[in-house]
């Protein structure tokens, strides 16, 4: 593991650690896809990860545009966060993942395990706390399921029943997204699972100030990355060199369009 990877292996988001990492990579993360890097970087997190890993640069319109070495469910959550959070939070939360995406792809069993973790963590750590905060009478059954460590499927079915209750629209929509994610999990569509789980997160993002939901989402992304294969180990000097060279290339640059949607 390179120094850059070790620096954030514990996912420290202190101002000192983030500042040190930003100075090393010197790369600005932006929303959307981009045909070429600019003098400040200026790409999404997945495009920056291409550069860091030494791949030829390409605009990333969907996770299918990434090399096979990128885990699809991991890349999907990174893409969704990249295109949703505000600039300052994007830099803080996602820049540490630039050196951790290439080489993360694993077999289907592992990828499904990652997708399941992302969905279950979304339900347990983000959706259920929001429902508990609402103090709806129908939550007693859901709390019992959570307390006895019920399966993701049981939790999703309970959420589906809650979506027909008299809850605020944001919560009912989030419950539906979680249930849809469970349906995708049963069909073994790991990328679709993550996309639906993220839609549930996004519905709830306005419930807590200062982007707290997305901070939890980045923590879930880190947990998923700890399952299975890890990023390729390379010298930090090589990674920094690649990032610098990409910024120096005299190529025209314009922002390419990308809409946050599921593309299988």
Where are these regions (language model features)?
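Short, glycine-biased loop/turn motifs at secondary-structure junctions and
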Residues: 2-264
């Amino acid at each position: 593991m390179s120094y850059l990877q070790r620096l954030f292996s514990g996912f420290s988001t202190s101002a000192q650690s983030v500042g040190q990492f930003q100075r090393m990579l010197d790369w600005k993360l932006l929303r959307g896809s981009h045909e070429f890097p600019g003098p400040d970087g200026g790409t999404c997190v997945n495009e920056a990860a291409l550069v860091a890993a030494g791949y030829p640069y390409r605009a990333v319109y969907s996770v299918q545009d990434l090399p096979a070495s990128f885990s699809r469910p991991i890349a999907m959550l990174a893409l969704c966060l990249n295109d949703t959070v505000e600039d300052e939070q994007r830099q803080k939360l996602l820049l540490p993942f630039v050196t951790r995406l290439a080489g993360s792809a694993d077999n289907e069993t592992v990828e499904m395990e990652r997708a399941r973790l992302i969905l279950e963590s979304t339900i347990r750590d983000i959706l259920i706390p929001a429902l508990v905060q609402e103090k709806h009478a129908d939550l007693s059954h859901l709390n019992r399921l959570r307390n006895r460590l019920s399966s993701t499927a049981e939790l999703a079915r309970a959420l589906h029943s809650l979506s027909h209750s008299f809850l605020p629209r944001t919560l009912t929509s989030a419950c539906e997204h979680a249930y849809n994610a469970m349906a995708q999990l049963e069909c073994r569509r790991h990328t679709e699972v993550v996309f639906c789980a993220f839609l549930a997160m996004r519905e709830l993002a306005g419930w807590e100030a200062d982007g707290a939901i997305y901070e939890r989402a980045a923590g879930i992304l880190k947990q998923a990355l700890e399952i299975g294969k890890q990023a390729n180990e390379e010298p930090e000097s090589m990674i920094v060199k690649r990032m610098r060279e990409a910024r120096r290339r005299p190529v025209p640059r314009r922002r390419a369009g990308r809409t946050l949607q599921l593309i299988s």
